[in-house]
Every structure is written in structure tokens, then in C-alpha cells.
A protein has these predicted regions:
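ATP-binding N-terminal substructure of ATP-dependent carboxylate-amine bond-forming enzymes
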Residues: 1-101
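Active-site nucleotide/adenylate-binding loops and adjacent lid/helix of ATP-dependent enzymes
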Residues: 107-146
Length: 146
């Protein structure tokens, strides 16, 4: 049986990951964590842990490493963008645990709206015109500002 540790299971993405894995035919044991005990995935996981917030990076990482060791985790699946950044930066500390995240190049592009727009444009994917705050933007509406 493979042991999978999923972070941020209380959010929509975490819930989707947990629910999809539960529906699979894989022999897995799911351990989940979230900053809130009462959440949409609490009853779906085999074990639940209340986690510190990722904003306290060292505290959050110590919590993750502790669970990885004590619960003999095979796979770590960080869900939120900030948690993915932390795990990507420190994944060598996990030794033999497999981390379920994209490769560093994909993360660099996908986690930056400007780089994503440039990448898609170069690839020929139709995208809305993108302006950076240092440029003069459109003078007509409607428009989306992010």
C-alpha cells in the first residue's frame, strides 16, 4: 500500500485530488492536512492532521518533514501555489519521497502570469493581449486587470 500525503485538502483543488484518488483502484492510504480541521475533505482521508499555515515557512516545513518521516510517506502532493514553491525549493530534504509537482521549468512559467502569456503567444496559442504595468495599457473597455 502506497502512502500519499496531500496538503491543503480543505480547498477545491485538494478536495478534487482526494476525491479522485479515492475513486481510483489504486492500493493507497491517504493522509491529508489543512489549516482548518472542519473542511470538505476531512472525512475522505484515512488520516487528517491540522497544519500550520505555509506563511510560517519553517514551521510548516518542519511539520511536513515530521509527518513524512513518522507516517512513512511514499508520495507528497502539495496543492497550493505557495506550498508548491516551498516544496520545490526544499525537496532534496525529502530524500526518497516522491514529490508530485511539475518540473521546475513548468513551475517557473505557470506560476507567473506574464511568463505564461509570453510562452503561450510564442507557441501560437490564441491569447488576449497582455500589458505590463510599466506599459501604457488599453484605453478602451471592457478589459480584465490582474
Amino acid at each position: 500500500m502506497r502512502r500519499i500525503f496531500i496538503t491543503a485538502i480543505g480547498g477545491d483543488i485538494g478536495y478534487g485530488v482526494v476525491k479522485s484518488l479515492k475513486k481510483s483502484n489504486h492500493d493507497i492510504y491517504i493522509i491529508g492536512c489543512d489549516i482548518k480541521k472542519y473542511n470538505c475533505s476531512y472525512d475522505l482521508v484515512d488520516e487528517f492532521y491540522l497544519s500550520p499555515a505555509y506563511m510560517k515557512e519553517d514551521e510548516w516545513w518542519k511539520f511536513v518533514l515530521g509527518l513524512v518521516v513518522s507516517r512513512e510517506i511514499d508520495y507528497l502532493w502539495p496543492v497550493t501555489e505557495p506550498e508548491i514553491r516551498i516544496v520545490n525549493k526544499r525537496k532534496e530534504e525529502l530524500h526518497n519521497v516522491k514529490v508530485i509537482i511539475n518540473n521546475p521549468l513548468v513551475l517557473e512559467i505557470a506560476m507567473d502570469k506574464g511568463k505564461t502569456a509570453e510562452y503561450l503567444e510564442k507557441a501560437g496559442v490564441p491569447t488576449p493581449h497582455t500589458w505590463w504595468k510599466s506599459e501604457d495599457g488599453p484605453k478602451k473597455y471592457p478589459l480584465i486587470v490582474k
